[in-house]
Regions:
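N-terminal catalytic or cofactor-binding beta/alpha core of small enzyme domains
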Residues: 1-118, 123-134, 139-143
Length: 143
């Protein structure tokens, strides 16, 4: 299962959604792909029953734009500073910890953060993030 999180109307904050759309194009039909905009608490329900879930969101940590980082969320707490949550009322890291407390984490949960360059309203994905989206979607569908 691949879940893209973000806001398509705020520039690079749409990176997770773009990865989900690209994975949907590349992956076999049996791969479940979801796009979530808004409050990340919906993640807890979205990955319910999944043995392995991949979540992709934008990051704003000061790394170079287009940098992709992977976190093993089932193994421990996510570094909150590495994930963007300002356009989500409740961020991915918060949703992971809520699911952990409720005993509702998938057996394996990989969270990918794509470093953005611009999160302005009405903007599109930056070239660096577009490349990262394509590279990550390809890596996820052709391991």
């Amino acid at each position: 299962m691949v879940i893209g999180v973000g806001n398509r109307w705020r520039g690079d904050d749409g990176a997770g959604l773009a990865v989900a759309r690209r994975v949907r194009e590349l992956a076999p039909a049996w791969v479940e792909v979801r796009e979530l905009e808004g409050d990340a608490t919906a993640l807890v329900e979205a990955w319910s029953g999944a043995e392995h879930a991949v979540v992709v969101d934008a990051a704003e940590s000061g790394a170079p734009p287009g940098t992709v980082r992977r976190f093993d969320a089932a193994a421990g707490r996510l570094p909150v500073h590495s994930l963007r949550s300002s356009t989500h009322a409740f961020g991915v890291a918060d949703a992971v910890e809520l699911a952990r407390a409720l005993g509702r984490l998938p057996g394996r949960l990989d969270v990918y953060a794509i470093e953005g360059a611009s999160f302005t309203a009405g903007g599109s994905l930056s070239p660096e993030v577009e490349r990262a989206v394509d590279d990550l979607a390809t890596a996820l569908t052709h391991p």
